[in-house]
Amino acid sequence: MDAARFQSQHDSLIQAAELALRTLTPAADTRPARLHAAMRYSLEAGGKRLRPVLCLAAAQAFRPAADARHAATALECIHTYSLIHDDLPCMDNSDLRRGRPSCHKAFDEATALLAGDALLPLAFALLAQGYADRPELSRRLVAELAHAAGSTLLVGGQTEDMGGLAAGADADRLEFILLGKTAAMLSAPLAMGALIGEASETDVEHCRLAGRAAGIAFQLVDDLLDGSANAAQLGKPVGADAQNGKFTYPGLHGIPATQARIQQLTAEAVDHLSACRGDTTFLRALITRMASRDR
């Protein structure tokens, strides 16, 4: 896919994701205003919008007219809630997120905690309401996202990650962290988009596995950038992993092995998408670019 065509499609998907976020979530002045202002502050902070884009693109790959806006917004709500909570002093204690003060710095810790709490049920309300006319689809989307965001994946990965190096530096534990903390929430968007696009069960699984491989690769790139980029590039403090005693792939296996694993995982993700019967050209290009990003 040539660069101009990719950029045009990517920009279009970003715009669709941003519009959905603005129109499908409560306004900042909804009572209680401070809570909703904190929610909107974090939702509208920008970022890559990677999860919504993956979901929208996957749906369109199988059915160009598919409407995945509610699912895309639900995914960003879950992702944003996890970032708000990750930044709290009791977790990563990060003052900067997406290039501006973290939610608890812009408001206060209690409001940030509650804003994250509120985004979680909002995500599932979006799935229930947005696909009410397709109850089986709604059920499957809720199940997919709940599993990805639950105690064995997203929250479980964060729990293990909080233990840092002190909890033991073994490869199995690291894989659990990578799969849970990052990969699960890149696997779910592709699977959910495929479900909305009425893909076959085989293709839904290909998308799920592609997201899993791409998600682990995404985290490994993040780990490398944490040691080499600057705060302006990343939009968050650099060197935080080392500072917080975090357990990372480069720390365990070294930089050359990390770079090789990124290439292997990216190829695996592309192969899964190539096996799908939908038009996954854009998704394959996006995942390839994710592996070589500098922010």
Language model features with spans:
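N-terminal amphipathic/basic leader segments beginning at the initiator methionine
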Residues: 1-26
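Short phosphate-binding/catalytic loops that engage adenosine nucleotides
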Residues: 278
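Mg2+-dependent prenyl diphosphate-binding active-site environment of isoprenoid biosynthetic enzymes
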Residues: 25, 29-270, 281-291
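Non-transmembrane, amphipathic alpha-helical segments
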Residues: 5, 9, 42, 174-177, ...
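Short cytosolic juxtamembrane segments of multi-pass membrane proteins
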Residues: 294-295
